[in-house]
């Protein structure tokens, strides 16, 4: 049930915009679109029953003539309606079948001329003509144009990749501004900016693309760039010129990929300045000349090495490029969730009496727009002739409530002459302001299978009541007389790990971790194994769980329920008082848990609270008494503390913030949230799970060098880590980033000095998390020549895997099979060599690995036979399993994060407003970024172009003064109402509210508490970095747009 920590994906979030020029029309010409085949990965058949059929669309040349917008309106149409922080991106799930696209729009051939601005105000994109009738009127009269260039052919792509003239990359879009996208090239530490809709060339979030880099002279300066001198403490004598020279002399940067388990929900922001903005009168050399010069110095090298050398020589430059081909379309194209722009279409129809009839007669040449909930996706065109009958009928009857219905669509075509992709509706969920439709949409969008288990997968399950077969009793070590207990959340039903401890002579302890032996029930290549591999992981929502395995297995015969005989995989360590492992034993066992403790129960025992056996404590089973349980928990707590201290001394890193926990009523509806942090009992369990995972990784990687499933976490991004170092130095904090251990020690010293400011500690941890990325599963055979890359940076260990949660993670089952094979190989080897059982059984799984035995003819044969029997996969198959499990794990995390946001939104909607304190994390002339510690989230507050508000930014002192204007602004310009940036109350209202709160204080009203806690500020308000200011949170969207959480300044004024 536990993992080491929670994974954190830190995205680059960067803004951009586009400026266009009209071109002369070129009539009666159609382009020949070069297509690039999609690279199909090995996939499994979808079990979610999603309809993959596609309505065939007729040629829509006439429709294109009437409805294609001209380029003057593209800027507004490209941006999403509402900008909000989306979840971490997920690579396309390879476990779902692809759907072929059918062309719906023609693509006339016209030249492209659309250039991008650099980082416009995202709020300018919040409302576009697509939300009213103007867009439809403009589309009607637009002419056919070729907006995008044709994609390169497959031969051209292959040739360019071989010559190093183009690069294959993963396409990611900025959630704050869709005009900015970033491409990750494997082996390159800096992402490539793809600035503008034309340069993105119809690529969609998650696509695998081929990009061509712009000349070096067009690369803009990287905002937020920190030189080495800036990262040094004040008082150093090294001048900036020397530091810059050192930076240019570097020829490579370490590549980083991931972070095991972070806790921040926030994302970093590195904003580029647009392709044209980096040009100076003395431009740097061209990219080609730099590549040639670098190769002359270094000899033969790959295109990636050349690019890394250039980036190292020009660390202040942001590389830019353009997409020339989409080689693998993201499967998220098939599950885009959003709302139909019904009101805009109705307004368009009503603007012309000839079109306004009731009921309307809908033409197949017309369409309605779909506004995606995720701002990383473009608006979609849904032609009427592919609309479901129910939606079409409601449109004909001008049903305005249709706009509140949450729908899913799939992209079927995006021609060179269309500003938007063409889509068709695949699912209707319900009203966007209700919980259940939103949850179903989240699951659908992340391709989480919530259907019943197939009948075939259930046939291999044992019948209940189930007892341990006699042959298993004979084969396994019987530990039913051992005091074994479980510690889990109070609501847990899938108990897959248990603990035990025994005191040994000489001050030693024998600690046991016992994991449910799921591989006994889930055999390789069975229907149950196929379904478990397809689901890959259990998905935990707030009030329910979507299991990877059928409940009969995960909650009954496989779960380590108290008082029941259960099959387990056990690891027993003999430890001294310093936490050193003296000896170990690994094997398959039979256990019987004596009790199921919650984390709170275990914490009460650790804290020494009396009468632990009373007041609703769990029942005891077997011959054990509560004194046995309390002694075991206390001993385990002491040992885990020793192990934890030793792990951090060895360089482990721990970044953790508190997070809100939701309170639900009897109907399962959230009504409030409270802050919760982990207890000592959580760390107790975590420490032994980490030790078990590290032990399993060591055993299987030694026994099966080319076919072990491990989990790696490379070092963090060097540039971002240096930015964090510079940030700390600027604010008088010494940070050592030379290793994970030094980073941990530095953070502990800094936070020790800030122990009275827990909010700033949270902010510091957020900054520290941003250079980190996701850890990932991998097959050792893929990195057999790069063993140094197997390590785990955050845990500071050379080998790590997942072994302890086989009821909810498929990789753990794979690891169990490899471990079972290693045990079987030991038995086979001992029989062949006719050695003593104790000696033979320790050769592959003992504390000392017998390399000579493993490399002998008998050893190789034993390992091979055991691998075949237990289903240890080959390198090729295991690589596919690792990649797919990475995708599914990330999808499950995205579901969890989206549900957290959904429940927060729902509680705020009920409260209407939520006053709270916020800490300013970022400050400028247009907006500030604030951190709300109660929710653990960051939000932006924009204050420029607000009617009645004056925001003076003092650059010299980095100070913002916000004041109220008592007269209207002169001149022309668009200004938004004050209520969008400020929640303004009268001092009289505050006094009345406080009096009311005091009068009902005995009722413990939540409203009374919130009003009592935070008081509004008054004008003028002076704000600096890290200032604490009052804000009001509120729910945004639902029936009328994507869900978001808005923040405004909380101010008081008589006027």
From Swiss-Prot:
Main localization (coarse): cytoplasm
Any one Pfam family match given in the protein's UniProt record, by short name: OB_Dis3
Protein localization: Cytoplasm
Gene Ontology BP, a term: polyuridylation-dependent mRNA catabolic process
Composition bias, Basic and acidic residues: 39-59
Domain RNB: 476-824
Positions with biased composition (Low complexity): 97-108
One cellular component term from this protein's GO annotations in UniProt: P-body
Ranges of residues in domain CSD2: 367-446
Keyword Metal-binding appears in the UniProt entry: yes
This protein's record includes keyword Cytoplasm: yes
Region of interest: Disordered: 1-109, 229-249
Bias type Basic residues, positions: 17-32
SMART domains assigned to the protein according to its UniProt record, in alphabetical order: RNB
GO molecular function terms noted in the UniProt entry: 3'-5'-RNA exonuclease activity; metal ion binding; RNA binding
Entry binding sites for Mg(2+): 488, 497
Keywords: Cytoplasm, Magnesium, Metal-binding, RNA-binding
Alphabetized SUPFAM superfamilies for the sequence: Nucleic acid-binding proteins
Family indicated by similarity: Belongs to the RNR ribonuclease family. DIS3L2 subfamily.
Function, in words: Probable inactive 3'-5'-exoribonuclease. Is unable to complement the growth defect of a yeast mutant lacking RRP44 exonuclease.
Protein name, entry field: Inactive exonuclease DIS3L2
Native organism: Arabidopsis thaliana
Lineage of the organism: Eukaryota, Viridiplantae, Streptophyta, Embryophyta, Tracheophyta
